[in-house]
Amino acid sequence: MKYQKINKLVLFRFISIWDQRFKFESLVNVFSILITTICTFSVIIILSVNDGFKKNIVNILTDLNGDKRIYPDEYLSLSEFDYQQITSIYKDQFKISRFHTKKCIVKTSQNSEAMLWMSTNKDDYFFENIKKYLVDGILTDSTVVAGDLFLEKYDLKLGDYLSFFVFKDNFVESAYKFQVSGSFKTNIPDYDSHLILSTYNLFDDEIEFEYFQINDFENTVSLDKINKKYLINDASEINSSFYQWLNSYDNPIKLLVFFIVVIALLNIINNNYYLLYYKKKQINILLSLGMNNASLKTIIVIRSSLYSIIGCLAAILLAYLFIYLQSNYYLIPLPGYVYFTEYLPVQVNFYYILFIFPFALTTAFLSSILNYNLVSYE
């Protein structure tokens, strides 16, 4: 009974964050918890922003380029018959859009620009989905929409007309003139400055398609039924340069997180060592009074674990509060054409918590035991 009271008294004294009699030691405790909080908060925010940034880029690329594309295998183009055949096989298992593209020269009143002209059917998924990128005007089946950067570069306004010259074998194959009825903005400069969108209802001649685009594709769907007749490209092949860039961008982020984790580790280890080293006399007195090593180690482990939990909990609350506010109210704006988004992207991911607590508690436990053994032999 006597030893239980001593254990409780020692536990209370050791886990106290602030003690008026030992202000410097108390400041060290507060500073240690603060460092744990800052490090954990930084890791959560960095990973959340990184995931949000990648998700934003992938979503834009998927909206514009699809999850997969179907190309002709034996012939130069796809037909309406191919479209009907594929949709009859897979029905509503994914969204499919028909694309007719033209590489052309677009002439304005000031200058000319090489552009990619993409046209689709007004009833296809792409036609409806692209509307979320429209910043002004509308997309109709008798007009075209252009990227925000292109319109800004040549000081064009909605209602202006553009002349299109389509070349084949260095000769003008066809020429068109259509009104600009809207502008879109994806925050990807190449698209917003060199892409024209329309429906293929603009063309009088019979349309053939370069490819079909698949969106909302589930990996459980098998394309074996059409694999032999058509070439099928995955998103990673369509957007290979972007995906390679995203992967290379990922490495510095991982390195930064690693260094922050190392700082957090050193902080926990250093705090435990400081406690044991400067309380060495008190520990020896407690041992001489009859307290056993196991009880003292348990108290040190509880203290270290408690400090780690307090720091991690504070960081988690602050981090997810910030993520919630940023995802709903867009507190931090960004230059769109630099970061491909107009606000700091964040991704809510609670799996970070599953890693943080076990890692912090394991570190606290091991550093407490190792430091205790180290100091006891000094």
Please provide the spans of the model-predicted regions:
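N-terminal Sec/SRP start-transfer signal
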Residues: 1-40
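Membrane-proximal extracellular/periplasmic loop immediately following the first transmembrane helix
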Residues: 6, 59-109, 114-121, 326
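Peri-transmembrane interface segments
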Residues: 22-30, 222-278, 285-286, 299
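Alpha-helical transmembrane segments
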Residues: 26-28, 38-65, 273
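Short beta-strand boundary microenvironments
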Residues: 115-153
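Basic-flanked hydrophobic alpha-helices used for secretion and membrane insertion
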Residues: 118, 154-233
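Transmembrane alpha-helical interface segments in multi-pass membrane proteins
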Residues: 282-327
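C-terminal membrane-exit region of the final transmembrane helix in multipass inner-membrane proteins
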Residues: 348-378
